[in-house]
Amino acid sequence: MKKMKLLQGVILGGCLFLGLFFLPSIGANAASVTMDGVRYWLIDWDSEAKGHAELDPDSDLSEVYIRNEVEFLGKSYPVGSFWWDEDDFMVDSDDSFAEGWGQADLKETNTAHESLRKITFAPGITVQGRAISFKKLEEVVFEGEVSYMDEVSYFNCPKLKTIVLPSSYGEPVYRSEFAIDIKRCPSVQIVAEESNPHFQVIDNDVYSKDGTILYNVTSNAKKYEVEEFVRHIGEYAFNGNNTIRSVTMPDSVQTVGRYAFGEMKKLSSIRLSKSLRKLEEGVFLGSKKLKKLDVPKNIKRFDGDFGWKKNKFKKMIIRTKNMKKSSFYDLSKKCTVYVRNKKVKRQLRKFDFDGKIVVKKKK
């Protein structure tokens, strides 16, 4: 976004020098043109690339259409992509969404976010980025093939009705590539095209085709039980959910991805799988109502990122008799950690935990 603003200034200055002035009828310059609630960038830093479109933040239109071609000054400019305005909805513009939905600024808004009900994409348009806090958005329509660049991501869009996962959408590698992250959209129905080789939808949650990986939980339930056939819980799978109070994880689950249970505003209890070997980075970051954690004996490694004040743990029971390299420096000092032997106590000190540790041997 900053690149584009800088580019716009440079191009505009050059255009003014050449005598090309604004066209007030459509609010355009040589870098962009705004029409019908949409801003089209016609000149990109890659001269061979197609232009892209963004919403006009001041638009009060309830319906907008994203064109795949724009006529300007007698020339036709192709448009290939649409970018959601996620950068304007961050608590800290110098940060990112890498730690999950806690970075989303839910107090931020603009006219477009208050007004938009339906957005339609012309054939050939690829959607990029995260759609955040569109209060009236109900319909996302693709006239051609459904196409997303990096991730299918919608957050805090309470009236959103349907999201389609196209057959062309690839297998997730990490969050920024072929990820699915749809949270706080209580009215949404997620549909995976049958021909998609990587995904299926069960009870509105997204799984791998064979069901062994749970990618995205959209559930509005208060109590959530992970299915017995699940072997892996993906990165950010529950992150940002604001209805679930308790999670029960069967022993079939072998791995849990980074930040999977982070920013869950009502989560107060979780039962972990006895098959887990480690807890990934930031797995509970920002879930402040989670005060107690019972860690099964097979979990020997913690990758940290408890987040200082972003966690409110009071009691943690670690059942392993030997820990591997871990990080506890930012676990709250108000948390009392119960361990099985003095060896684990020494290891916790080595891993920078400064709070109270109690050795309590198993009876």
What are the functions of these language-model segments?
Residues 349-355:
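Helix-loop-beta element that forms the nucleotide-linked donor phosphate-binding surface
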Residues 2-14:
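Bacterial N-terminal signal peptides that target proteins for export
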Residues 30, 35, 58-80, 91-104, ...:
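Structural signature of tandem-repeat unit edges
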Residues 48-58:
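A short, structured beta-strand/loop element
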Residues 83-86:
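Signature of short aromatic-glycine-proline-rich micro-motifs recurring in repeat-based ectodomains
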Residues 33-43:
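Short N-terminal segments immediately surrounding and downstream of signal-peptide cleavage
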Residues 20-33:
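Sec-dependent signal peptide cleavage junction
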